[in-house]
């Protein structure tokens, strides 16, 4: 048996993070939330009043406040910039609606990708994001590209927000997700697209358990081959 690298890509609210966390726990792998890293960079930019015109300053903030991951007492993941816990603030709508322009800055992506690649060198890791299989881990042993309808993804985000006590409007979420899809798939740097050797999986109408089972079966076949 060997520890492999699993890359899960897909558009906003396609269920990537939820599935990746469960699989990481089941396989005893490390879960690296790349989306949280870009959200953290966005959070730092917004907190300091920075825009796409302030790239050097954003890079300075990332250097002064390194992003790290930890675990809460119940095992749930925590995200920090410096020593500040920003696990919940980075999920706010303001961060969500600004992350695309931050993630499109080449220098920011380059810095975060190099950090992700270093962490993944040993294997036994699962990452989810927009360009894991195409840019971050092009040689990952398993690549999955998850998709789902805009309506279903908006419903998922709506339920998540309500459960977390975040105000939400379903029609607004549908519009925001459709706009995010367009931005992510049309940006010049690392546009959202499946890797040539990725398995595309439409999760519309499929339960979380069903998605987890599908991906784990693929992973175990590769692991067992050694």
From Swiss-Prot:
Keywords: ATP-binding, Cytoplasm, Kinase, Nucleotide-binding, Transferase
Pfam families linked to this entry: Cytidylate_kin
Subcellular location: Cytoplasm
Name used for this protein in its record: Cytidylate kinase
Enzyme Commission number(s) of this protein: 2.7.4.25
Residues reported to bind ATP: 10-18
Keyword field contains Kinase: yes
GO cellular component, one term: cytosol
GO MF annotation list: ATP binding; CMP kinase activity; dCMP kinase activity
HAMAP family recorded: Cytidyl_kinase_type1
Family per record: Belongs to the cytidylate kinase family. Type 1 subfamily.
Superkingdom of origin organism: Bacteria
GO biological process, alphabetically ordered: nucleobase-containing small molecule interconversion; pyrimidine nucleotide metabolic process
Catalytic activity: CMP + ATP = CDP + ADP; dCMP + ATP = dCDP + ADP
Keyword presence, ATP-binding: yes
UniProt-listed NCBIfam families: cmk (TIGR00017)
């Amino acid at each position: 048996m060997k520890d492999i690298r699993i890359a899960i890509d897909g558009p906003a609210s396609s269920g990537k993070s939820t599935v990746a966390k469960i699989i990481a726990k089941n396989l005893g792998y490390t879960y690296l939330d790349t989306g949280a890293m870009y959200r953290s960079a966005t959070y730092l930019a917004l907190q300091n009043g920075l825009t796409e015109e302030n790239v050097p300053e954003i890079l300075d903030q990332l250097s002064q406040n390194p992003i790290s991951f930890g675990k809460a007492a119940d095992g749930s993941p925590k995200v920090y910039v410096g020593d500040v816990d920003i696990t919940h603030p980075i999920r706010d709508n303001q961060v969500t609606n600004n992350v695309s322009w931050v993630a499109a800055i080449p220098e920011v992506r380059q810095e975060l990708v190099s950090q992700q690649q270093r962490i993944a060198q040993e294997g036994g890791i699962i990452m989810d994001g927009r360009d894991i299989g195409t840019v971050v881990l092009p040689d990952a042993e398993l690549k999955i590209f998850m998709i789902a309808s805009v309506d279903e993804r908006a419903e998922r985000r709506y339920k998540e927000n309500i459960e977390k006590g975040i105000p939400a409007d379903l029609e607004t979420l549908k519009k925001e997700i459709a706009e995010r899809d367009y931005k992510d798939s049309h940006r010049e740097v690392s546009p959202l697209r499946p890797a040539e050797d990725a398995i595309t999986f439409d999760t519309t109408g499929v339960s979380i358990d069903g998605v987890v089972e599908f991906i784990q079966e693929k992973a175990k076949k590769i692991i067992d081959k050694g």
